[in-house]
Regions:
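A bilobed periplasmic-binding-protein/Venus flytrap-type ligand-binding module shared by bacterial periplasmic
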Residues: 159-170, 292-305, 328-329
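Pocket-flanking alpha-helical
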Residues: 89, 109-146, 236-237, 257-262
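A conserved helix-loop-strand patch within extracytoplasmic ligand-binding domains
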Residues: 146-201
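Bacterial signal peptide processing site
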Residues: 36-38
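C-terminal motif of bacterial Sec signal peptides marking the signal peptidase cleavage site
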Residues: 30-34
Length: 357
């Protein structure tokens, strides 16, 4: 019996030991699970990648204004109402858009109004200024305020004058100078219903630089100025008169393709002088127009706002013959200014490539 009691006591002790071991094992498992749970949270380390993405987004947003600032501005070119100006602008537009990637807007505006727009940056550049008519503008906007810049010569030499068909000189050689028109009977040959007894002097667009009314008054000529309204209107009147060999006296200029199409004679006026033109503001001009070295002007801020566009326009320079070839394509061949300019660009890469910055 005593042996049996001892045996039972040993069995119970073993059971208690097993229970303790099981409890210890369970506690150990829980501890390991807790440690393992901590390890399972390691994917949270991916958070910095998300933060980097957010930072990249913020950086992109911060960079956006910088990119916007780097966008090319629209270059606004002044187109004056004559064909030479139109083809100049068309050439510049092609190169600015195709070679430098600038958007270009062509603004039709008269040659006097353009100065105020250039001063404010509403216009970027004008590519054909005739200096004899713009002394006051140069003094105010370039020399005085410094808001417009002379960006160099275009190349062609221009000359405004009085013209009549050469057949009129053959009929009356005295008409080769202004003195031939001083005779009222001779001047009356150029009269129209609009001018009565006076001869008609056909001018162009009223916005053009022209001193003809002053010249006529100061020389005492029996002539009256009538504005045709445009270059095309002068050419139409010339074509009509020429086909009938009728008298016509008109304002025109070189370079222009009409001198290849028609036999014209420039009427001699008293020789140009600086002293004569010093009286222009008071209506005192009584002499010929000067030979003009055509030049280009730009908004003074263009150099900083669009340095490569500024460089191209500043370098732009070609010959009188270059310009006449494009004007002839428009006036004689019936092409648009854009078509004439593109043909010139296609044929003259050696010239314009030197303008590129």
């Amino acid at each position: 019996l005593s042996d049996l009691l001892v045996k039972n006591r040993r069995i119970k002790m073993k059971k208690r030991s097993l229970s303790v071991l099981m409890v210890l094992s369970l506690l150990l498992a829980l501890a390991l699970a807790a440690c393992g749970g901590g390890a399972a949270e390691e994917p949270a380390a991916e958070a910095p990648a998300a933060d980097a993405g957010a930072a990249a987004g913020e950086a992109a947003e911060e960079a956006a204004p910088a990119e916007a600032e780097g966008e090319k501005i629209t270059i606004k070119l002044a187109e004056n109402p004559w064909t030479g100006s139109m083809v100049n602008v068309a050439v510049a537009k092609i190169l600015l858009e195709d070679r430098l990637g600038y958007p270009v807007e062509v603004v039709t505006i008269d040659e006097n109004a353009q100065w105020a727009s250039l001063a404010t940056g509403d216009l970027s550049a004008s590519l054909e200024v005739w200096p004899s008519g713009h002394a006051e503008n140069v003094a105010q906007y370039i020399d005085g305020q410094g808001v417009v810049e002379n960006i160099g010569l275009l190349g062609p030499i221009g000359k405004i004058g009085w013209y009549t068909p050469s057949y009129m000189i053959e009929k009356n050689p005295a008409l080769v100078t202004w003195e031939g028109f001083a005779d009222p009977a001779v001047a009356a040959e150029f009269a129209t219903a609009e001018t009565g007894d006076n001869g008609q002097f056909l001018a162009g667009d009223p916005s053009w630089v022209q001193y003809d009314a002053d010249i006529i008054k100061n020389l005492g000529l029996p002539l009256q100025v009538v504005n045709a309204g445009s270059e095309q209107a002068i050419l139409a009147a010339l074509d009509s008169a020429y086909s009938r060999e009728e008298p016509i006296l008109f304002y025109f200029w070189t370079p222009h393709s009409i001198h290849a199409k028609y036999a014209l004679t420039e009427v001699g006026l008293p020789e140009y002088s600086d002293a004569c033109y010093a009286t222009a503001a008071e209506g005192g001009v009584a002499c010929d127009y000067p030979a003009d070295e055509l030049f280009k002007i730009a908004w003074s801020g263009l150099k900083d706002a669009a340095p490569d566009a500024y460089a191209l326009l500043k370098a732009m320079n070609y010959t009188t013959e270059d310009q006449i070839s494009m004007v002839a394509a428009v006036e004689i061949d019936g092409k648009t200014a854009e078509e004439a300019a593109q043909a010139w660009v296609d044929a003259n890469e050696a010239t314009w490539s030197a303008w590129l910055p």
